[in-house]
């Protein structure tokens, strides 16, 4: 295959460093990026291959797809080996596995975060999507490790045929690595691993899972316990992932949540943290020309769990924004419909949320996260959720 040819052409760079692949529906970017940041801060030479950005020892190289093609990957890895990189953390998407973009790569470890409804427009069925992810673990060598989230029922399935050494992590079940949330606020969490407590700048239960995956990986790779905890307390949010801004007594959170599960996770995390006095205003859209079955589900989740919802455009691509919004609205239960409004223009939707917000309210802008563009009718328009909401809240004075 082209993967093996590419590997050979660059003289198998993946075998000359420790390549760790991270797969799952949610958490890939956070786990990969924060592992890279952790190792970088520790003074170890590390590389990152992710949706948001590629890094080689602190130098940035642009990125668009979760898993680039095999030629690009091997070229990046070859460059990393030349620069003396010891560890590379890489997001592995199901598209990347199925299109054999990672064939010929030698992984030192694989991490499974969770599996939920995502990319079903591409994979046809959940079972097919799950089996593609499992394929990654089936192909790990016996020199590698796999680390799976034991609280996800698919975790066990992922590693049932792997030759790698299996480790598990979880909050609920008995696992090799466990974490406990002691306190939680929008500013961060007080966590406990083994008998040691540490503070993290990350919020939300889903981030406790991400941090535990990071801790477990560092431990498996031989980093001392106290050093790992110290480095973990220094980690900051990844851009566009639970990105937090407080201006004029209003909190805005920008997050990439674009699957039903990710949306539910982030709203539940905010609801667990806030008192009953503040309202949560959620702004949400769904991408055009993509899996339509998730639209009513996301409409239902947003309207059931938020105080107010503004349905708007995400990346409508070649579909009519109004049609996409209608699909989302169709999932709203009658008793929740009073909480919802629809504003197709995303900038207007954000502006309206800022006007509706009272002191101490929380605005969640979901779906696009770190993205700098909005795709409308085959054209990319500059658009940054964080910048737009910051501008709106600043003007409110």
Q: What does each of the following model-derived ranges do?
A:
Residues 25, 51, 149, 171, ...:
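Cofactor-binding loop segments of dinucleotide-utilizing enzymes, especially the Rossmann-like FAD-
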Residues 2, 98-100, 120-121, 156-157, ...:
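Glycine/Thr-rich phosphate-binding loops of Rossmann-like dinucleotide-binding domains
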Residues 2-150, 154-163, 212, 218, ...:
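Phosphate-binding loop of NTP-binding sites
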Residues 213-226, 230-240, 244-397:
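ATP-dependent carboxylate-amine ligase
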Residues 47, 167, 177, 196, ...:
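Structural signal for short hydrophobic segments within the conserved structured cores
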Residues 94-97, 153, 173-175, 236-237, ...:
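Short acidic loop-to-helix transition motifs that present clustered carboxylates
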């Amino acid at each position: 295959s082209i993967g093996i040819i590419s590997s050979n052409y660059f003289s198998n760079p993946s075998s000359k460093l420790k390549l760790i692949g991270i797969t799952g529906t949610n958490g890939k970017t956070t786990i990969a990026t924060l592992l890279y940041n952790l190792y970088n801060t520790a003074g170890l030479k590390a590389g990152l291959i992710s949706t948001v950005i590629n890094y080689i020892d602190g130098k940035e190289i642009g990125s668009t797809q979760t898993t680039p093609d095999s030629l690009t990957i091997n070229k990046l890895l070859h460059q990393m080996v030349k620069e003396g990189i010891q560890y590379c953390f890489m997001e592995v998407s199901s598209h990347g596995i199925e299109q054999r973009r990672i064939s010929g790569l030698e992984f030192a470890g694989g991490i499974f975060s969770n599996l939920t409804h995502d990319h079903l427009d591409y994979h046809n069925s959940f079972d097919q999507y799950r089996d593609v992810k499992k394929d990654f673990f089936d192909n790990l060598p016996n020199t590698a490790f796999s680390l799976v989230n034991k609280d996800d029922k698919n975790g066990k399935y992922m590693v049932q045929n792997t030759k790698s050494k299996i480790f598990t992590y979880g909050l609920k079940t008995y696992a090799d690595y466990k974490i406990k949330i002691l306190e939680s606020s929008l500013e961060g969490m007080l966590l406990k691993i083994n008998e040691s407590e540490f503070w993290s700048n990350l919020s939300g239960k889903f981030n406790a899972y991400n941090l535990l995956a990071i801790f477990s990986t560092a431990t498996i790779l031989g980093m001392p316990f106290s050093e790992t905890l110290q480095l973990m307390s220094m980690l900051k949010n990844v851009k566009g992932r639970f990105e937090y801004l407080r201006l004029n007594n209003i909190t805005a959170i920008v997050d990439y949540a674009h699957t039903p599960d990710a949306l539910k996770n982030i709203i539940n995390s905010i609801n667990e943290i806030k008192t009953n006095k503040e309202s949560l205003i959620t702004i949400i859209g769904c991408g055009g020309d993509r899996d339509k079955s998730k639209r009513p589900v996301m409409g239902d989740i947003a309207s059931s769990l938020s105080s107010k919802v503004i349905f708007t455009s995400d990346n409508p691509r070649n579909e009519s924004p109004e049609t996409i919004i209608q699909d989302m609205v169709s999932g709203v239960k009658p008793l929740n419909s009073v909480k919802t409004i629809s504003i197709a223009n995303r900038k207007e939707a954000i502006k309206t949320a800022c006007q509706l917000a009272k002191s101490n309210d929380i605005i969640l802008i979901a779906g696009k996260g770190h993205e700098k563009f909005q795709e409308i009718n085959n054209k990319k328009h500059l658009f940054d959720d964080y910048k737009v909401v910051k501008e709106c809240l600043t003007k409110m004075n």
